[in-house]
Amino acid sequence: MNNKKNEKTTNNKEIANVLVTRGIVFYPNTKIRIEIGREKSIAAINDSKEKKQNMIVVSQENPSIDSPSKNEIFTVGTLCSFEIDNKHPDGSYSIIFTGIKRVKINKLSEKASDGEIKTKFFYADYSEIEEDTKLSKSNEEAIKDLHAKFENELNNLTFFPKKDLALSKENRHTIVDWLPIALKFSLEEKQQLLEEPSLSKRIEKILSFTIDERVSQKIDSEISKKINTNLSKQQKEFYLRERVRAIKEELGDISSKEDDAESIRDRVRNNPYPEHIKKRILSEVNKLESSSNSNEYSMSKTYIDWLIDLPYWQKTDDVDSLADVENVLNNNHYGLEKVKERIIEYLAVRMKSKSAKGSIICLVGPPGVGKTSLAQSIAEALKKKFVKVSLGGMRDEAELKGHRKTYIGAMPGRIIKAMSKAGVVNPVFLLDEIDKLGSDHKGDPASAMLDILDPEQNNRFSDNYIEEDYDLSNVLFIATANYEENIPEPLHDRLEIIRLSSYTENEKLSIAKNYLVKKILVESALKKDELKFTDDGLSYIIKRYTREAGVREVERAIRQIARKFVVRQQKEKLTSQTIGVEEVKYYLKKEIYDYTKKDKEYMPGVVNGMAYTTAGGDLLPIEATFAPGKGKIEITGNLKETMKESVNVALGYVKTNAVKFGIDPKIFGEIDLHVHVPSGGIPKDGPSAGIALTTAILSALKNVKIPSNVAMTGEITLRGRVLIIGGVKEKTISAYRGGANDIFMPKEDERYLDDVPEEVRSKIKITLVDTYDDVYNRLFK
């Protein structure tokens, strides 16, 4: 880009876009190539290129910060012209800058780029720093000494003008500005030289800095002697390689191989890569240059690209506002109060300790209850990048940790790939379906996960392909699972389990009303007054067309209605419609599901149990009857082993206490008892139907009708104790929905009644029981 005039404000202030570098200091009259990869920098370059304007190049104070604030940037920089040397496939640039003059940044501001994606970048109004080029005789001698001493270093610089190798009065200020680039000065020293307007004082500072460097070299001389042999060998190799390169260049036979190598070296020198990574990259670059065939070159180049593109210092700033996190979670997710409370507590401790170490969150719950979207909301709330790896069905350890480079087509594992995609060292990293990890002869991925999730080890994670330690300690890992019992025990030990239960119908209604309908209307290009849903219509969809723990089927049903309505809009010129129960039936046709309701008539031997299912809960009718026989018991209804045992325990308890219950003990040898649980196509298991089975048997034997509005749940022992069960919330809601408002449950489950919505609790009677006598006294006396 040619040197063009920059914009001026109404007050004649000069304005230019600002490129912030990681410790690279520019000077007037110099020329250097820089790799540009940060989004802000790319946006600033594109804007300046489009407007054909020069830029201010200035360094940030701390090179390790990925996104410096205004206060973390030096206020003196260099106005530069620039040309784009190369644009890389990932959108980054190689830019050659030419320094024009020293400038003082008066005011640094931000603005957004043009185009669809708005990226903020810095611009500034600035003023030129007037330079004093007068020299005393002693300083004239000093510049001659410096030029003579460091002539080779200057000559080795890629863009140093050969015409300036001979010192003259006209070019001495140019030589002084090139010297800090040729010599190994610290960032602070380089910035001091940029901010100094006096040529005489700049020479004095350079003399001072080089003397300090010489003292340091003298201290290290003994160490240098010990490695002279190896160094001499390396210098010889370097010399010969450069000779070959020079000959090829002279013949016009220079290939892109050398250009690639030099570009990689520049990128490594100009960025704060960890020392062991720098060493490995430079070693691989040497192999790249000496590779003799295209396959070898391609493999080396691919490996270097993976190694150099991984994030090592880039990070997003941490968010310290719990209120912001809470707002995002509440806006994106209805209900789940206890889950959100646990997440807030977990994040609060991380924020306070400023440490990434600690247990890993694992969200456990049925499909569709919002585990993945919760993880995405956490990333959004913390303003962090979000990446996801699906672990379902993974059986090969190499999928996680990569294949060794000796294999054809070797690549890094999914962890390294995801980190490269994130582009920062501290993303939110979702490990989806961790309970579905498998294992076979190729290895055990669950064991490989231990290195990744253990905070004491994951700062040295080793991928088989990368072969260098990589730090995962800044990553916020979140795992998800459907079934907690399927998580391998060593992994389970490292996880903090947060359980998400299935949504109630009221919760599903609120989610559909406040989230799903709005989302689907936007997707279908419909306005909110074109298609409206009543509460009755949405409730009918939930009850009669879906049976699930989450809301995915509800979303599909609403989307189906929206599609069919759009078709009618096009064909029948229908302008708007309100969707109630009848409209739902019209669009979705025949109902798919029904929920179990209480019987209208009372009958001996029939009792309502309460079932917990993956779709929430349901009433579980239990029937018992007997006929003359020889004391046999028949059990039907597709009952699994545990529930069959519950039938036998219930019968054993009744037999033992027959006299107390007013039953002749002899009758058990004279009848055959039959226990049946309807809906035989559905497998049923668990011990929680114990007291319902006992009541059904007693009701049949005593010929006592149990009111159909009664439902019960609880495990029973042979001594008549009623033991704690799970799924209190789901069972209670389903019982109320089915018409049962008089519920018996174990005393020990009292602690879970707070989970039951108030609108349900206020309309039912709950009897808490310690022993079966409490049930018997209420129903049979």
UniProtKB/Swiss-Prot annotation:
Q: In this protein, which residues make up the domain named Lon proteolytic?
A: 601-781
GO molecular function terms here?
Answer: ATP binding; ATP hydrolysis activity; ATP-dependent peptidase activity; sequence-specific DNA binding; serine-type endopeptidase activity
GO CC term, one of those recorded: cytoplasm
One biological-process term from Gene Ontology? cellular response to heat
EC number assigned by the record: 3.4.21.53
Catalytic reaction(s) noted: Hydrolysis of proteins in presence of ATP
Query: Domain Lon N-terminal: where?
Result: 16-214
Give the enzyme's main class according to its UniProt record, as a single word: hydrolase
Which keywords annotate this record?
ATP-binding, Cytoplasm, Hydrolase, Nucleotide-binding, Protease, Serine protease, Stress response
HAMAP family documented for this protein: lon_bact
Name of the protein: Lon protease
The top of its lineage is:
Bacteria, Bacillati, Mycoplasmatota, Mycoplasmoidales, Mycoplasmoidaceae
